[in-house]
């Protein structure tokens, strides 16, 4: 049994005969006598238990995870009067996660009201307050699942304490010096998020018809605010891997966004054929962000995980303010409920861009024709038909930050930790920030072209909608790498052009609609293809996130985004090159996967039979790829199903492989011939240790078909003003995917990496529940 974490060790059936730990043979641990049929477990000895165990298989994942439970409760009160109304709601959601010490508590309150002060004057408001506390555990390399997934099945995490006897701060784990034991992490590490948020608005509206029925003017002023504070507390307890003496971080954001909106809305029924609408408006958005952070390392003594116990301490504060002023207008003209023309324009002035590029204008125009309003085209089959087209521009400001100085932190080149932090002996240090901003930075611009049709057949029996759109994006704002000689690592600049082709189709069918039986279906199809056309001069691709390898990148000519990493070595015919044992060789760093799917198709149905209502939602994603770090690590450590199968097989091989022969051909190139052998079970460990360095080996097709939700509801009581409904539901109960055991939509990293990577993710879950709704 090898505690280094880098050897598979013997099979369960051979543990008792292991030359180092086996109880059937003479070794260091059997000097006092043999322990037939058993083997010595150092971790049991360290925990003060009987060190001898009978070999057997354990299910560490089953022992570690628990059944998550969520409770949701809400109450809503609403009432209407002759000249007003109000509503009040209160809700609470409490959940326990599938990992102990994780969960959420959330409370929300909403109050709204509206009153007619006069024939021409109306006022109203709505306010929402939400407070939540979320308890989490780490993911990826810091994840609690890392040891759960990589511990050999002969080792019981549940049966062996996670710390040595008498010392709760020294871990007792099979994979020491790499990652925290999952149970130890749940007991000693914590990641807490506390949030409070208020958002709402109030308005005053004046309406007049000028004494006629053909004109109407609404003048409305609305002021709103969205303010929230989120505080995070990250604790790595004394004895954690990487931060041996502990780590504490307290950081938080306070965001306040005020919105002032003034609109003038005018409606004019010119005559029986023409209707004119106009909208003029002004919007002011003022956003303030305050960010504070305090970090402490190396606790003076264990047992008190607090910043005040840190021997190395650092803190920082950041404040940002952004203001946007927008003026906009919209003009619409309708003719005979048949032709609709709309023209809009908006000009924004932002404070977050360089002074010369703060103002930008973006217009739009759209035209729609309801051709079934033409008398000659009216019929009982196609009861509604509309063709539409539009052109629009959208401007999006970036964030320009003048050069500034910051206090650096220097790592020691090892996993986790920042051992050198200022102040040092009371002295601070400041250096220029490593990202610089182009002083000519300008807003990103998107031009969109759209064509579509909306069709309804047989008075709503069938509905069909299709939309094609093309988006051309220019002046994208990217962080472009710079040469080290510049004194900076990268520059934020306008560095790209992209285009997107989008196809969307919705189909609705309602074949049955009777008093006691209703049936309807709906399909939603979407195909979105994004391509990178240009980047900054001299830049072929940009890293969006990831590791040294693999990475998520945006590359010229590639579908956005792509997975970039070490691929298989291939010959001129595209065959994977293997050695004489059938073990593949590493090739060049290249594009090894495309993240975006070919298409998505959603399907939902509702069936009402008497008072029962059954609903189902399916989702099909076709295409797209994901890198699975979990698969790579569990194969490497020999704990995956595949590694067990290869270990037992006589000939595991690639269907399309080649092996290099001695010598070269007439052109001086290597000679490759088809490989017909395979990896022997005895070489399985060598095989998986080799392919660990080939990222392409763990890029999987990310297609899936999900039964997202199945629900059944029934009104059990209805009398006078009292209605009682009950419902049951199941979510994610069926998933077909090449990636087994995990949710194919699991993802880690920033938004640019969404759907591209997973590493030590939590297992996929299904949920079952019931609900009771009472209305009176």
Over which residues does each language-model region extend?
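A mature extracytoplasmic/lumenal domain signature
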Residues: 92, 127, 618-620, 711
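Residues embedded in well-ordered regular secondary structure
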Residues: 1-100, 138-141, 185-192, 200-207, ...
């Amino acid at each position: 049994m090898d505690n280094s974490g880098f050897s598979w060790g013997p099979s369960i059936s051979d543990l008792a005969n292991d030359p180092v730990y086996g109880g059937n043979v003479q070794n260091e641990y059997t000097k006092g006598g043999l322990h037939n049929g058993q083997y010595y477990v150092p971790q049991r000895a360290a925990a003060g238990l009987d060190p001898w165990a009978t070999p057997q298989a354990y299910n560490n994942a089953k022992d570690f995870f628990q059944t998550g439970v969520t409770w949701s409760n809400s109450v809503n009160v609403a009432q209407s009067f002759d000249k007003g109304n109000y509503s009040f709601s209160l809700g609470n959601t409490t959940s326990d996660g599938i990992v102990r010490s994780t969960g959420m508590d959330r409370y929300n309150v909403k109050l709204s009201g509206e009153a007619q002060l006069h024939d021409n004057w109306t006022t109203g408001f709505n306010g929402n307050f939400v407070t939540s506390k979320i308890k989490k555990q780490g993911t990826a390399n810091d994840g609690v699942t890392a040891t759960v997934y990589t511990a050999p099945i002969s080792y019981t995490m549940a049966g062996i304490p996670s710390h040595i006897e008498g010392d709760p701060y020294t871990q007792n784990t099979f994979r020491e010096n790499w990652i925290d034991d999952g149970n130890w992490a749940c007991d000693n590490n914590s990641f807490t998020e506390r949030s409070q948020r208020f958002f709402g608005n109030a308005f005053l509206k004046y309406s007049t018809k000028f004494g006629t029925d053909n004109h109407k003017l609404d003048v409305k002023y609305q002021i709103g605010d969205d303010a929230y504070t989120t505080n995070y507390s990250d604790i790595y307890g004394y004895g954690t891997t990487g931060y041996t003496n502990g780590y504490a971080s307290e950081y938080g954001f306070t965001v306040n966004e005020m919105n002032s909106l003034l609109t003038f809305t005018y409606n004019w029924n010119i005559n029986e054929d023409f209707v004119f609408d106009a909208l003029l408006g002004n919007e002011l958005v003022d956003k303030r962000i305050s960010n504070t952070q305090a970090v402490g390392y190396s606790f003076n003594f264990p047992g008190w995980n607090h910043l005040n116990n840190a021997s190395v301490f650092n803190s920082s504060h950041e404040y940002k303010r952004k203001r946007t002023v927008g003026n906009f207008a919209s003009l619409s003209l309708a003719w005979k409920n048949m032709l609709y023309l709309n023209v809009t324009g908006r000009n924004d002035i932002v404070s977050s861009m360089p002074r010369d590029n703060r103002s930008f204008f973006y217009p739009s125009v759209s035209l729609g024709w309801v051709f079934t309003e033409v008398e000659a085209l009216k019929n009982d089959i196609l009861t509604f038909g509309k063709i539409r087209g539009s052109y629009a521009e959208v401007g999006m400001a970036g964030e320009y930050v003048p050069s500034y100085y910051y206090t650096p932190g220097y790592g020691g080149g090892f996993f986790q930790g920042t051992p050198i932090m200022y102040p040092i002996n009371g002295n601070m240090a400041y250096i220029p920030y490593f990202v610089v901003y182009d002083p000519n930075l300008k807003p990103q611009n998107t031009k969109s072209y759209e064509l579509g049709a909306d069709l309804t057949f047989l008075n709503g029996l069938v509905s069909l909608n299709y939309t094609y759109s093309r988006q051309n994006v220019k002046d994208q704002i990217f962080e472009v790498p710079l040469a080290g000689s510049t004194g900076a690592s990268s520059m934020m600049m306008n560095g790209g052009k992209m285009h997107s082709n989008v196809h969307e189709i919705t189909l609705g069918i309602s074949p049955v609609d009777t008093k006691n039986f209703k049936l309807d279906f709906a399909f939603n199809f979407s195909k979105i293809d994004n391509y990178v056309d240009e980047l900054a001069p001299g830049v072929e691709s940009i890293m969006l996130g990831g590791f040294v390898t693999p990475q998520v990148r945006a590359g010229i000519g590639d579908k956005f985004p792509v997975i970039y990493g070490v691929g298989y070595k291939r010959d001129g015919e595209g065959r994977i090159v293997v050695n004489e044992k059938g073990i593949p060789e590493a090739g060049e760093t290249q594009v090894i996967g495309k993240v975006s799917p070919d298409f998505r198709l959603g399907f939902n149905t509702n069936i009402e039979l008497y008072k029962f209502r059954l609903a189902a939602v399916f989702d099909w994603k076709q295409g797209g790829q994901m890198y699975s770090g979990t698969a790579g690590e569990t194969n490497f450590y020999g704990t995956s199903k595949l590694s067990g199968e290869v270990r037992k097989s006589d000939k595991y091989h690639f269907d399309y492989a080649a092996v290099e022969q001695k010598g070269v051909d007439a052109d001086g190139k290597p000679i490759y011939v088809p490989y017909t052998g395979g990896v022997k079970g005895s070489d399985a460990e060598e095989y998986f240790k080799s392919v660990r360095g080939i990222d392409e080996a763990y890029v999987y097709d990310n297609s899936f078909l999900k039964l997202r939700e199945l629900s059944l509801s029934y009104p059990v009581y209805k009398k006078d003003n009292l209605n009682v409904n009950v419902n049951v539901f199941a979510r994610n109960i069926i998933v077909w995917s090449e990636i087994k055991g995990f949710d194919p939509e699991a993802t880690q990293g920033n938004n640019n990496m969404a759907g591209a990577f997973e590493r030590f993710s939590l297992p996929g879950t299904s949920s079952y529940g019931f609900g009771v709704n009472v209305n009176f």
